[in-house]
């Protein structure tokens, strides 16, 4: 263990820092890093270099080269830069490369050098050009801040949802600030800049002068500033060689350190971790690296090559032409286990396990010592935690063996932490491999989450590894394997070296009916790449018509979309396609398409009935559908025309159509309606009142109610209304008028074709029993009992029923007998029944 701590460097009394190698870089750099614009993404992300930068005087006519490497130095992309001069490079949280040009344009490239999009930082930049730029990260996304030639700042907090904010002007600013950076206070981005001895804080509305708490006097300029990874802390390098460290609000000072070096550093970044004992700042000059904190002494390293610093959540990555290293504060668990002469439970357990492997009795002694102190659980937990922070697999295994050894002597130690750590380390070791080149630490991995890591593997097209990780961790299929296969299929759809049929077949063979995979999404990606036929073939595998149809419409394959919509049976989907076709095709082609699709034609007719009547008429005319055309004109006569002449003309057109359809009944009925309309208009003119649009029966009834009996009878004769129906109409009308005298005359005018029971019923309906009794006596024998019961003459009804010897009538009368009043009648009926049964 003494040898293991050889690269530990103390910073003060409470913390150690160590630097270890991540990779030996094999990239073939033809120039020094200092001659390039450099950008490295956090969380073990890729490195971008723009060679032959414009700031170099030589070879100004040679196009620069943009190169992208993995963290291990493996090339990912290389492309000639054909656009304007670049001021700054930076990576977004989604690992997209942002290239900020002098003209304010920001070009966005993918990890493999594929151009994604571009946007502008405003019109002001066109006149004043960009002097400097920063790419920063907030919880909203990745942002860009620029300094223009007019010494004004503009920023966007989220390039995914571009909203430019022009920051307030700094009073008296006549030259570029000596240094500046972006801060994030209360989820709002700010800009902190230094002008001579003064610091200014800009938000979207104000410019405020600020002073760091406890800053040593004598400062005439700030040369460098750095904000921590989480935006909580700030470091300022002054021209006096002092580094002020404090909170980002500048209200609280952590410490101040004298570097005894007044030359401005190339880079200055924070090096800390969550729950850090000793937060530190790493400062890099040409050949010197210094780690300073709240301690009288600093840690210093010699840099053999030009190096670049990448701040991380829990440390700093340092890469050069030949190496890629990681500098961080030694975690507490590792420090307690490996510190010289440590008697921590984890240290004793590790020694016990080693002695056990040697078959030494010292193993028992160490174990007993831990158990006597009651610290065995703590020892196991320390070893598990320390294993997560170790980079070398051999040391990970040693610590996990020690933890496993200690667990054997515990009755109820929950295994989850041990199992999860083993799983996490297997994943981390896999992605740290040189050929993968993602050197995540355990802390970064937990912050990033497994889903984001899988997304980054997919972004690198490392599909097999991503699937292996999903299967190993047993992630739900929709979140894991299915999602990755969908990404693979989208990538495969862009492969131009294969025929459309082969690509579609390969994708289907791999995906099958995998849950969570949408063939329409893959087809959309293929269409976006210009492979329309491949997209159509892929849509054949999409089981959901609702996903097929919109894309087919987008691809201008409307007729195929209509067929798919009809197959689905979804009428809303069919209507969507029909409306699209209507706007896309000329009228003749549209109608011809409908004729070949009966279901679509039927649905469109339904639509036209409510929305487009003229189109409906055209459809009927084109199909020579005279029956429906006649019905259309009948509806139109009532819906649109108010003048009687127009309505009659429309009805005449309808009658002609019915004749053509050989529907004589409908034609005659239509002609009768025309005749009725003319009569109704004449009645209105002669008699007044409302007759138009009444039915024939209502017209007759209205005439009777108005006392125009002769006109009613004439109308009945004209339209051949049967006598029975006319008597019913007149009976109802006279009863409504309560004209009982006229009703009696009407009943005696001739023999009633409907009998006289209706007279009884309608009189009783009008609550006139007196009149009803007049007609009850005239009712025929077969309905006599019912009529007598209606007028309440139960005794007479009983006499008639007994006389008829009709069992049904006897039962009916008996059901109307109530209480003691009708008791004698009921007895009489019962005796009559008994006599009838004897016979």
Curated annotation (Swiss-Prot):
Give a Gene Ontology cellular component term annotated to this protein: early endosome
Which domain of life does this protein belong to? Eukaryota
| Topology term for the membrane | Peripheral membrane protein
Q: Name one GO molecular function term.
A: actin binding
Subcellular localization is given as:
Late endosome membrane; Lysosome membrane; Early endosome; Cytoplasmic vesicle, Clathrin-coated vesicle
Q: Which UniProt keywords apply?
A: Autophagy, Cytoplasmic vesicle, Endosome, Lysosome, Membrane, Nitration, Protein transport, Transport
Q: Which InterPro entries match?
A: VPS16 (IPR016534), Vps16_C (IPR006925), Vps16_C_sf (IPR038132), Vps16_N (IPR006926)
Region (Interaction with VPS33A) location: 642-736
Q: Which GO terms describe its biological process?
A: autophagy; intracellular protein transport; symbiont entry into host cell; vacuole organization
Sites bearing 3'-nitrotyrosine, chain numbering: 4
How does the record describe its quaternary structure? Core component of at least two putative endosomal tethering complexes, the homotypic fusion and vacuole protein sorting (HOPS) complex and the class C core vacuole/endosome tethering (CORVET) complex. Their common core is composed of the class C Vps proteins VPS11, VPS16, VPS18 and VPS33A, which in HOPS further associates with VPS39 and VPS41 and in CORVET with VPS8 and TGFBRAP1. Interacts with RAB5C. Interacts with STX17, MON1B. Associates with adapter protein complex 3 (AP-3) and clathrin:AP-3 complexes.
Q: Which family does it belong to?
A: Belongs to the VPS16 family.
Q: Could you tell me what this protein does?
A: Plays a role in vesicle-mediated protein trafficking to lysosomal compartments including the endocytic membrane transport and autophagic pathways. Believed to act as a core component of the putative HOPS and CORVET endosomal tethering complexes which are proposed to be involved in the Rab5-to-Rab7 endosome conversion probably implicating MON1A/B, and via binding SNAREs and SNARE complexes to mediate tethering and docking events during SNARE-mediated membrane fusion.
Q: What is this protein called?
A: Vacuolar protein sorting-associated protein 16 homolog
Q: Which organism is it from?
A: Mus musculus (Mouse)
- Gene encoding this polypeptide? Vps16
């Amino acid at each position: 263990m003494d040898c293991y701590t050889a690269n530990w460097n103390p910073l003060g009394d409470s913390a150690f820092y160590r630097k270890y190698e991540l990779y030996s870089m094999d990239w073939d750099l033809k120039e020094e890093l200092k001659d390039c614009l450099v950008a490295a993404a956090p969380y073990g992300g890729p490195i971008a270099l723009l060679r032959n930068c414009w700031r170099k005087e030589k070879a100004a006519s040679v196009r620069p080269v943009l190169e992208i490497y993995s963290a291990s130095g493996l090339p990912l992309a290389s492309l000639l830069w054909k656009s304007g001069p670049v001021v700054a490079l930076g990576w977004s949280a989604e690992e997209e490369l942002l290239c900020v040009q002098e003209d304010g344009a920001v070009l966005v490239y993918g990890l493999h050098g594929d151009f994604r999009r571009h946007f502008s930082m405003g019109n002001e930049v066109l006149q004043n050009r960009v002097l400097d730029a920063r790419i920063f990260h907030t919880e909203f996304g990745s942002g860009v801040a620029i300094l223009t030639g007019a010494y004004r700042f503009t920023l966007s907090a989220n390039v995914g949802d571009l909203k430019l904010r022009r920051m307030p002007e700094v009073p008296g600013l006549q030259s570029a600030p000596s240094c500046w950076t972006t801060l994030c206070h209360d989820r709002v981005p700010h800009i902190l800049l230094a002008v001579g001895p003064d610091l200014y804080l800009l938000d979207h509305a104000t410019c405020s002068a600020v002073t760091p708490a406890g800053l040593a006097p004598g400062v005439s300029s700030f040369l460098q500033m750095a904000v921590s990874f989480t935006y909580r802390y700030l470091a300022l390098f002054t021209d006096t060689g002092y580094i002020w460290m404090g909170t980002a609000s500048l209200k609280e000072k952590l410490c101040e350190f004298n570097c005894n070096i007044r030359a401005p550093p190339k880079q200055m970044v924070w090096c800390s971790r969550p729950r850090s004992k000793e937060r530190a700042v790493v400062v890099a000059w040409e050949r010197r690296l210094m780690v300073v904190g709240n301690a009288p002494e600093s840690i210093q390293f010699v840099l053999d090559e030009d190096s670049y610093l990448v701040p991380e959540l829990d440390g700093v990555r340092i890469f050069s032409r030949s190496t890629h290293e990681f500098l961080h504060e030694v975690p507490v668990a590792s420090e307690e286990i490996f510190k010289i002469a440590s008697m921590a439970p984890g240290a004793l357990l590790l020694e016990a396990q080693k002695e056990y492997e040697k078959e030494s009795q010292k193993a028992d002694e160490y174990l007993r010592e831990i158990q006597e102190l009651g610290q065995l659980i703590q020892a196991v937990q320390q070893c598990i935690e320390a294993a997560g922070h170790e980079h070398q697999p051999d040391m990970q295994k040693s610590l996990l063996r020690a933890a496993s050894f200690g667990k054997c002597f515990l009755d109820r130690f929950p295994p989850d932490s041990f199992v999860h750590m083993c799983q996490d380390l297997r994943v981390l070791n896999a992605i740290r491999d040189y050929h993968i080149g993602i050197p995540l630490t355990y802390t970064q991995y937990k912050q990033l989450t497994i889903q984001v890591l899988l997304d980054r593997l997919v972004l690198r097209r490392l599909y097999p590894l991503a699937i292996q990780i999903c299967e190993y961790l047993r992630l739900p299929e929709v979140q894991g394997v299915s999602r990755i296969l969908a990404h693979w299929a989208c990538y495969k759809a862009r492969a131009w070296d294969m025929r459309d049929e082969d690509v579609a077949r390969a994708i289907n063979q791999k995906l099958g009916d995998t849950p969570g995979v949408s063939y329409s999404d893959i087809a959309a990606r293929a269409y976006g790449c210009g492979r329309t036929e491949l997209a159509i073939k892929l849509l054949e595998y999409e089981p959901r018509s609702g996903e097929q149809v919109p894309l087919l419409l987008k691809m201008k394959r409307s007729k195929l979309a209509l067929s798919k919509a009809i197959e689905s049976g979804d009428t809303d989907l069919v209507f969507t396609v029909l409306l699209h076709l209507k706007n896309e095709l000329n009228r003749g082609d549209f109608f011809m398409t409908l004729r070949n699709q009966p279901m679509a034609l039927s649905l469109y007719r339904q639509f036209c009935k409510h929305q487009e009547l003229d189109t409906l008429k055209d459809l009927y005319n084109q199909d020579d559908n005279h029956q429906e055309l006649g019905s259309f004109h009948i509806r139109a006569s009532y819906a649109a025309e108010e003048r009687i002449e127009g309505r009659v003309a429309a009805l005449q057109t309808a009658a002609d159509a019915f004749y053509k359809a050989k529907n004589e009944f409908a034609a005659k009925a239509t002609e009768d309606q025309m005749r009725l309309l003319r009569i109704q208009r004449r009645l209105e003119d002669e008699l007044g009142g409302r007759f138009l649009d009444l039915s024939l029966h209502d017209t007759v009834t209205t005439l009777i109610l108005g006392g125009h009996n002769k006109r009613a009878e004439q109308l009945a004769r004209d339209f051949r209304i049967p006598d029975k129906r006319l008597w019913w109409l007149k009976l109802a009308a006279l009863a409504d008028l309560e004209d009982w005298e006229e009703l009696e005359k009407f009943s005696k005018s001739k023999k009633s074709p409907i009998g006289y029971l209706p007279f009884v019923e309608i009189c009783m309906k009008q609550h006139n029993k007196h009149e009803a009794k007049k007609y009850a006596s005239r009712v025929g024998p077969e309905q006599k009992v019912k009529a007598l019961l209606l007028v309440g003459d139960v005794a007479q009804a009983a006499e008639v029923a007994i006389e008829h010897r009709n069992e049904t009538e006897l039962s009916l009368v008996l059901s109307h007998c109530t209480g003691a009043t009708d008791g004698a009648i009921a007895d009489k009926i019962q005796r009559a029944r008994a006599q009838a049964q004897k016979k």
